Amino acid sequence: MKKYKTGLVLLVIALALLVYFSPWFFLHIASWQKEFNQLISENLHQIQNNSIKAGTTLIFASFVYGVLHALGPGHGKFIIASYLSTHESQLKQSTILSLLSSLMQGIVAITATTLLVVVLNLSSRYFKLSQLWLERTALLLLVFLGCYWIWQGLRAYRKKAKLAIKSLNPLPLHEKSAVKNNRTFQPNTCSCGHQHLPSPTQTAQATNLKSQFLVILTIGMRPCSGAIFVLFLAYMLDLYSWGILAVLAMSFGTGLMLSAFAGIVRYARNTAIHLGHWYSSKNTKGKSESIVKLIAGGIMLFFALSLLYGTTISTGGSKILF
């Protein structure tokens, strides 16, 4: 108990310091991103002269750029934090989720640039339009994810607590049957020995897999602008393969930082659960989890609709489609 209280106090102090220094921190993050963006551009130009040295520096600079990109503000951390706050997960599972989400961003950027620029050779105007629709698709997925969590929260909140048997005390048997019974029964199976319906654990696992898939798609469908810039520049310099490697390194750096962030969120959730265990019952725990999921889904839905509306507002110039 004392360990969790100490961890909670340290976490609150860290969050307070982060909020206090966030303007300075994000300003410097943006400045460092510009510097590494310039470094990436310089090394792409130098690869033709010294491919090994410039290429190694390019990959390293792209990796650091991905780390800085993850440290700055973004929708990925918000989605990951919302998911891990409302769903029980293991550390390995949350790490894989963060890495796959970041890798999905890189794959979408590479696929979109390859298809529209390299294969179809479309103009930058059409490419910007495709970026806009990718962003809208990601926001529509975010709307769906928010509605899905709200529905899950409402269903869990209305669900009545089931009666559970805490212990069974068998009576002593004075006589033992001479017939040996070799039949064993597994939970969630009928007398024929087959499982006809999924167990509660399997159902919960399938539901979590759906949510995880939606999280990966929602984050991945909105590629990083830095990755798009690197791919465009690499294509113009006829170094597209180096651009792909740089984007993959960028995605890996982003994924590592998101994994660290996911570990912090998971620790905070477990700490809150352990502290609440002393003054809450199983029924109130289920109700509080459903309320948290409702709030997270509502906030996600609000921001998704606001950002989606923002994509329909013209900021100057004409658009091919709304």
From Swiss-Prot:
Main location: membrane
Annotated compartments: Cell membrane
Family: Belongs to the NiCoT transporter (TC 2.A.52) family.
Domain of life of the native organism: Bacteria
Assigned keywords, A-Z: Cell membrane, Cobalt, Cobalt transport, Ion transport, Membrane, Nickel, Nickel transport, Transmembrane, Transmembrane helix, Transport
Organism, as annotated: Haemophilus influenzae (strain ATCC 51907 / DSM 11121 / KW20 / Rd)
Its job: Efflux system for nickel and cobalt.
Membrane-topology descriptor: Multi-pass membrane protein
Transmembrane annotation, as ranges: 7-27, 54-74, 100-120, 137-157, 228-248, 294-314
Source lineage: Bacteria, Pseudomonadati, Pseudomonadota, Gammaproteobacteria, Pasteurellales
InterPro entries: Ni/Co_transpt_high_affinity (IPR011541), NiCoT_RcnA (IPR051224)
GO biological process: cobalt ion transport; response to cobalt ion; response to nickel cation
Keyword Magnesium attributed: no
GO cellular component, one term: plasma membrane
Name used for this protein in its record: Putative nickel/cobalt efflux system HI_1248
Molecular function per GO: nickel cation transmembrane transporter activity
